[in-house]
Amino acid sequence: MWQIIFLTFGWDLVLASAYSNFRKSVDSTGRRQYQVQNGPCSYTFLLPETDSCRSSSSPYMSNAVQRDAPLDYDDSVQRLQVLENILENNTQWLMKLENYIQDNMKKEMVEIQQNVVQNQTAVMIEIGTSLLNQTAAQTRKLTDVEAQVLNQTTRLELQLLQHSISTNKLEKQILDQTSEINKLQNKNSFLEQKVLDMEGKHSEQLQSMKEQKDELQVLVSKQSSVIDELEKKLVTATVNNSLLQKQQHDLMETVNSLLTMMSSPNSKSSVAIRKEEQTTFRDCAEIFKSGLTTSGIYTLTFPNSTEEIKAYCDMDVGGGGWTVIQHREDGSVDFQRTWKEYKEGFGSPLGEYWLGNEFVSQLTGQHRYVLKIQLKDWEGNEAHSLYDHFYLAGEESNYRIHLTGLTGTAGKISSISQPGSDFSTKDSDNDKCICKCSQMLSGGWWFDACGPSNLNGQYYPQKQNTNKFNGIKWYYWKGSGYSLKATTMMIRPADF
């Protein structure tokens, strides 16, 4: 198909080339010449004059076409006839020329046509091949572009699908979260209502508990008074029992003495008159010397007074006769007390208690006393400090402590600051620090400037007793952050 098209196109080019190289001229003799140029070859034809042309009968025939003046209708018809005759003559002449050319130039034209056709065919084939190659290349490029566009379109469709899926998921999550928020709001409203109801019930319960607490406090007060009475009766019974034992012992000695005297004929019949037995005691040493050697609670009398106070007497440690002025063992008693309470004493002699600064001051102001401090830690170790001279000044001197002559195993340096320090409580600050040691360290003590000891500090149980600045401490034995398990402070006369 392409070859036929190229062949036809080549033949048209040959004819066009032939007619384009066709020239007409007149020689010197007046004869007409026709020259044909085909490539490097040139062909000249001499043609005879045509004698069959019609003669013009009108004066306007020769130049009828070139006239510019207006003519009437008859002149126009004549002119058209003349033109038709001329056109017919020219047509005949051309036909003759064509026949002549065909006869004379047939062979050459055939060869020329063949050469031209071959050349043009080769060129056309080459052009066609090039066009085919270019078309194929363009087709491949178009195919590649289509593939790329298809891939890009597919990728975009996948991304769009993924975005659509993600959007659907997000919308679902938003719906779920909105639903959860609504549920939480409903639950929150329910809980708020429940909290309000619980607050109301709690207020009622608190009011009821307050009333019960008041009733329990009244009951505890009554029971405390009953317990105090029972303790008094127990102490009285103990003292009476001890006195009965002593009287029985004295009676047995008297009976034995009488029996001895009666069995001896040379003995004088006289009976010794015994002194009146002492029934009041200044301290536990006097009780011990009276023959009462059992540790327990006894009644002591203030010096130069009939006022009495209960104290625990230790008749076992170091020969006995010790009056216990302080004891800590389980944290059952709060030692963060006022000045008045430390002055008069508090707690129970059977457990944790403070005997009272006023009694100790009056007692140690009349005779020379020694002070022994016993300490226990949470690991089962024990230590003590013994001062061979101890006394407290009066209230006007803030019960200032005086100590000398330290011995013992609880440190070679006294953990109670010397010279004497004033006593301080939470409501009476007499220390040498602007920080109020009693409020910061807890309890009443001879703090000096929040010094190295405080046996009346906060009680801490085991495993909670380390790194406690406000605990029961004795610096020169266990350090400042160790809170002890038990402490006892006791005194007796130096000449016991």
From Swiss-Prot:
Subcellular location: Secreted
Coiled-coil residue windows: 159-256
Signal peptide: 1-18
Protein name: Angiopoietin-2
Function (record text): Binds to TEK/TIE2, competing for the ANGPT1 binding site, and modulating ANGPT1 signaling. Can induce tyrosine phosphorylation of TEK/TIE2 in the absence of ANGPT1. In the absence of angiogenic inducers, such as VEGF, ANGPT2-mediated loosening of cell-matrix contacts may induce endothelial cell apoptosis with consequent vascular regression. In concert with VEGF, it may facilitate endothelial cell migration and proliferation, thus serving as a permissive angiogenic signal. Involved in the regulation of lymphangiogenesis.
The UniProt record lists the keyword ATP-binding: no
Gene3D superfamilies per UniProt: Gamma Fibrinogen, chain A, domain 1 (3.90.215.10), Gamma-fibrinogen Carboxyl Terminal Fragment, domain 2 (4.10.530.10)
Any single Gene Ontology cellular-component annotation: cell projection
Biological process according to GO: angiogenesis; animal organ regeneration; blood coagulation; blood vessel morphogenesis; blood vessel remodeling; cell surface receptor protein tyrosine kinase signaling pathway; cellular response to growth factor stimulus; endoderm development
Tissue expression notes: Expressed in the ovary, uterus and placenta.
Glycosylation site list: 89, 119, 133, 151, 240, 304
Binding site for Ca(2+): 429, 431, 433, 435
